[in-house]
């Protein structure tokens, strides 16, 4: 079954394996047969006993006048035995082909000779699949077996596929999972082939249910095939406006189907494990249950009562507290101006996805936001292209910088989605399709920030919020604390996608385009975001496409411009400063002197916390040397640097468009990205090639340079802090700041804008470390394109392929005279 419940039909792949010999068309003449087939036919005829060999074939062919061979022809065939690789039968078949003998006629002759072995080469037997694999729903950890059986001659071979990927060692009739895992869920098909042809089995869907531990006892000894409900819905008492989520999970073979009922009536289109109402009202009160069935059996879940109304909770307080309710103690209002103990920001931009559409806007957005936040005295860590493991470790490092009263800001630009009010950030190594276990849950990070007793928690999420249909897990997160200091700024509203502006090669996301114009304003953060939302609403490019959504529990007038308390020399502050400075320390500029007298200057600049640029220049050349070139090479394998992308004449050629105006001219530039992957010191080689006057030969010299661990590499993020489990998604969030509507399935972003950018950090002592914001990009500067991009799910398209594959084809439609919107 497909995800929509339709039967899946397996079609042969475009490059399906075939046997070494292909059966020829019946009406083709023998001279149209392929050489390998002719030689195989000839070998069998040459080796055949008397009465079934080539002479008997010539005799039968002679019975048809036009195919009769002369004595000279037969003698010519006989003499072929005297040649080293001669074959009388091959000679005969070619002569018959010249006379117009068809495959059908040859088959008739072989039938008369009862030469079945040769006959099978011309009419190979087919393959018949007798047992197809069944779709089934199972529990994680169960023993599972998918079975396919077929008959054919001489024998058949099996190969299993999951979607479009061949399964290693899956070459038997049974595909066995000793302890099935959630990642094993998906669609499977078996290809059966022999030397002549191949067939595909029916599709089999394997649904693996990972149920909470609280249900484990009730499902011990569950059968792989018997229909059984493992997770029952539960009765609930909800306030109007809350989210209702009912879950029923069943296992069995064939795969179970679901139908939800309310008050004895079936609910239209509610045929999944989950039944959800984003905002309940009195009309949703009633009795609910789920009918589960397959072709062999059916069961009903237990009936549950959903009550909508006020809860009867009592809150204890003293008489003084009751009298002061609504009149805050003036002693607590120590100042009219909120102060931050410190300000820390983590900025992550994911662009170069391995199995999903690549993005461009995060490069510009993270760079510009870094410059702006540093002007507001934020300690900023900016990182590009992180894997899941690296994202988790980056968050760990971010949390180390937080403390009581510290302002924490997390910005993310990249693919994302939102399910059941929980936002998920997608790492660059996420599989296709991805699920919650492959991503980072923002609400989990918020909980960890709350544990630090931060003064302000700001989340700016520049990603899509569409629902991920491949992820049906309901996260159960620990309850968030009720703190009046949380602000969420979503680039788009629930269930919608985010867009980017293209302009001359570089890109801004729509959100950042408007945010950067107001970020430095001294206003309460929620007021600032409200004005950004108003600006976006006035732009004709975004109307009906993207709208900023703000969620906040902020009760004080806190702003990103709030000053930092005068506690510069407290122990906590010193630790934070040291930790942050450690992640932003560049190697010192150096001058290399070679024996020939040539001097080469090495400089270093930071584009992001994990991206560094090395620039080299020849500062002195003795007069007797008429030519010399210098370049850097032999970088650690951890950084995966392509030599073709190193030692370029301009920063732009290396992919560094943002800092070119701040780098010295007339150098060779090499861009090192993903410094977080560096496990040892950064050691590389500086090579010098030079030529003396009057000599034709070129002389080579080299020096090895060790610059230690630059920037973020010093934190050894590849080792981690052993806290990965802190971010693992559990099952249903009841936090007060979570969306109640179901939304996005892999989401995404972006593409480009050619403006001057400033703010590169150099290792030269004389260079300033402050930065200036990029020029604003106003709507009056009409961009080249306005593009929506979101992560695509592997869709069930089966034309010309044996499995559904992801497509990135664009379907453009008119948007304005100079703009185009592409929906991927």
From Swiss-Prot:
The modification Phosphoserine is found at residue 135. Keywords: Acetylation, Chromosomal rearrangement, Cytoplasm, Disease variant, Disulfide bond, Hydrolase, Immunity, Immunoglobulin domain, Nucleus, Phosphoprotein, Protease, Repeat, Ubl conjugation pathway. The modification N-acetylserine is found at residue 2. Changing residue 464 to A: Slight decrease in NF-kappa-B activation. The active site is at residues 415, 464. It is found in: Cytoplasm, Perinuclear region; Nucleus. Highly expressed in peripheral blood mononuclear cells. Detected at lower levels in bone marrow, thymus and lymph node, and at very low levels in colon and lung. The keyword Nucleotide-binding does not apply. It is linked to Immunodeficiency 12: A primary immunodeficiency characterized by onset in infancy of recurrent bacterial and candidal infections resulting in bronchiectasis and growth delay. Manifestations include mastoiditis, aphthous ulcers, cheilitis, gingivitis, esophagitis, gastritis, duodenitis, and meningitis. Levels of absolute lymphocytes and serum immunoglobulins are normal, but specific antibody titers are low despite immunization, and T-cells show impaired proliferative responses to mitogens. This is Mucosa-associated lymphoid tissue lymphoma translocation protein 1. It comes from Homo sapiens.
